């Protein structure tokens, strides 16, 4: 007889003697205790089962997420190439949606506004226009003949949040690689409040020859180069800011699609020369546009030039004629009353008007009008060219844009050594992958046990 059976027999014999024989047999003995403990354990398991299952599910999801963050296995060259191609495709997908302002499609675009590149660029382009309008000219033009009323607009309300004379490049820590490109120009001088015609006369006297004192195109070119000198500062700061936005977008998005720091840093290092080259091309193109507009031939086929020049001269002649005008009855209107009057000018007075004290005065006035109108035409053309060419083509959408560097073909061009250097796993990463796989297998086995 086993010890367990012998013990049970002795317990029954004991509880059949007085006074223990009065106790319910189901409440005494080891066998009764064992049965009740089993019932209690079953109740506890039923009560705690949902919590245990939820904890296992959470631990399993966390482990799978960490394994997914490590990417696919990267032991072989093909596995490494596949891993980096997946990174490139994820990058392209989010980049394309960001450039189309489809911010709702990705959580990172909804939460990280530094990735809303088109919006940042649009805001900075608006600021460029305001800066050029407010501070682009070195000397204020004549207020009296500014047809559009925009060249001498102080625009204080537009500049509450921007110190235009001391703008600095908007960069984040970690963008030191851009330092050699982003040479901050000297402080921008604000437009001088001196009399523009006096300035033109001074320049004219310092540059004229001894022939007839008429409007000289060579003097106009000198005036133009001085009047547009502030464009350099404004435009260089502008392109620096756009490059900073693009670089921050690239690095932030790369961090999102490639969380592994070692792989990301190696991949970024591999692309950095190409990225810096694309930034240089944009800066060089801005310099080219500045050179053409400021030092090239003064030329335009825009009819706005002739139209506006005619308006300015008509406005000045109208001002001259007001001194010769008188009030007369409106006979030419059939409905006019005898008391209705208007300003009239005699035909014989049309030959009268502005009298210049010298040929120099007329030459200065002609130079001012031509400089004013050409400045407005060239300024609009210049801003459009910088945005369309240097920003849109060279930095955002062109074939050699920095945003088009990380592509599957770029990954395919890498050698086996480069792939190993960039995507090959170190021992710590391999051990972490092994531990996660082991943990996932154990948790999945636990789920099977719970289901059973």
What role is predicted for each listed range?
Residues 1-38:
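Conserved phosphate-handling catalytic cores of large alpha/beta enzymes
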Residues 28, 50-452:
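Extended, charged coiled-coil "stalk/tether" helices of large eukaryotic trafficking and scaffold proteins
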């Amino acid at each position: 007889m086993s010890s367990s059976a012998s013990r049970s027999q002795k317990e029954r014999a004991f509880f059949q003697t007085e006074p223990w024989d009065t106790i319910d047999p189901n409440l005494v003995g080891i066998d009764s205790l064992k049965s009740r403990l089993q019932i209690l354990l079953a109740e506890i398991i039923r009560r705690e089962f949902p919590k245990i299952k939820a904890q296992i599910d959470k631990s399993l999801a966390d482990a799978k997420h960490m394994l997914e963050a490590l990417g696919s296995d990267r032991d072989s060259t093909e596995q490494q190439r596949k891993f980096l191609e997946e990174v490139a495709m994820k990058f392209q997908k989010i980049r394309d949606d960001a450039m189309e302002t489809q911010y709702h499609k990705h959580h990172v675009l909804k939460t990280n506004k530094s990735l809303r590149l088109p919006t940042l660029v649009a805001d900075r382009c608006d600021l460029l226009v305001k800066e050029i309008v407010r501070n682009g000219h070195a000397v204020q033009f004549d207020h009296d003949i500014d047809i559009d009323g925009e060249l001498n607009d102080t625009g204080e309300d537009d500049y509450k949040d921007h110190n235009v004379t001391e703008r600095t490049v908007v960069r984040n820590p970690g963008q030191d690689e851009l330092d050699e490109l982003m040479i901050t120009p000297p402080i921008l001088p604000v437009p001088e409040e001196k009399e523009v015609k006096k300035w033109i006369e001074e320049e004219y006297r310092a540059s004229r020859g001894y022939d007839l004192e008429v409007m000289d195109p060579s003097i106009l070119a000198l005036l133009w180069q001085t009047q547009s000198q502030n464009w350099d500062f404004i435009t260089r700061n502008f392109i620096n800011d756009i490059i900073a936005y693009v670089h921050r977008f690239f690095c932030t998005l790369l961090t999102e699609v490639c969380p592994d720091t070692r792989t990301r840093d190696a991949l970024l290092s591999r692309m950095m020369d190409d990225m810096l080259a694309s930034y240089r091309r944009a800066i060089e193109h801005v310099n080219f546009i500045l050179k053409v507009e400021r030092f090239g031939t003064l030329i335009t086929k825009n009819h706005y030039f002739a139209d506006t020049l005619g308006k300015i001269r008509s406005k000045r002649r109208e001002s001259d004629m007001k001194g010769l005008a008188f009030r007369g009855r409106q006979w030419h209107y059939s409905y006019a009353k005898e008391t209705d009057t208007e300003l009239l000018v005699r035909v014989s007075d049309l030959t009268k008007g502005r009298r210049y004290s010298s040929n120099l005065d007329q030459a200065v006035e002609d130079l001012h009008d031509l400089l004013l109108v050409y400045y407005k035409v060239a300024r609009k053309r210049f801003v459009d060219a910088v945005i369309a060419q240097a920003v849109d083509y060279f930095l955002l959408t062109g074939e050699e844009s920095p945003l088009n560097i990380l592509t599957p073909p770029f990954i395919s061009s890498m050698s086996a050594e480069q792939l190993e250097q960039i995507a090959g796993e170190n021992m710590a990463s391999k051990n972490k992958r092994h531990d996660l796989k082991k943990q996932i297998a154990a948790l999945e086995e636990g789920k099977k046990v719970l289901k059973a």
